[in-house]
């Protein structure tokens, strides 16, 4: 049968996407959407595209905290894909996320609404004094376990935290159980070329 005629706007959009692909632009930026952990996330060049390898990190945390109510902090949240995925799959969790970029945080907040989860987002430079005071509010913890996973030259950090008291992790008030970060990375050769 005869298909529907494309509007001028649709034709222009298709032409724009084809041209972007010809210039090796990521399809996710061209479409404005990336799939991650069974969910859709809006993406722009203000945030990195969620990578499939990052799903391994999310899966590990979900497995470790299934059925619990952990307090989780995601540092450098970007699109919010880690924080939002954790909040979606750990419904009892209290998830906070920080990023230095207001544009990234706006995108992350939109993604949280789109995926119908509650995450507390904060604009924060982790190298600033503000980060120290933010963490002092959650100071009654020590590192119980640190895990590093290396996949395709990417290093993920996942820190499990435990209170100094003998209370169970799930009942902690104002303390973190887990800090997760998947910061952007630049390979050493590329970093040298950027600096020079």
Where are these regions (language model features)?
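S-adenosylmethionine
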Residues: 92-94, 98-196
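A short N-terminal interaction module
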Residues: 1-14
């Amino acid at each position: 049968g005869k298909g529907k005629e494309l509007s001028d706007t649709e034709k222009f959009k298709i032409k724009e996407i084809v041209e972007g692909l010809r210039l090796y632009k990521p399809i996710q930026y061209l479409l404005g959407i990336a799939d991650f952990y069974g969910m859709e996330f809006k993406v722009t060049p203000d945030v990195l595209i969620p990578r499939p390898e990052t799903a391994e990190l999310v899966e590990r945390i979900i497995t470790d905290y299934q059925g619990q109510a952990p307090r989780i902090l995601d540092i450098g949240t970007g699109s919010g894909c880690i924080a939002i995925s954790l909040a979606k799959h750990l419904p009892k969790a209290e998830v906070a996320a920080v990023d230095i970029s207001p544009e990234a945080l706006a995108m992350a907040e939109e993604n949280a609404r789109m995926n119908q989860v509650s995450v507390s987002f904060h604009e924060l430079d982790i190298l600033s004094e503000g980060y120290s005071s933010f963490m002092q509010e959650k100071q009654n913890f020590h590192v119980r376990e640190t895990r590093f996973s290396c996949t395709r030259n990417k290093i993920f950090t996942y820190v499990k935290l435990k209170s100094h008291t003998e209370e169970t992790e799930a009942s902690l008030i104002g303390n973190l159980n887990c800090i997760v970060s998947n910061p952007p990375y630049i390979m050493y050769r590329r970093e040298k070329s950027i600096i020079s």
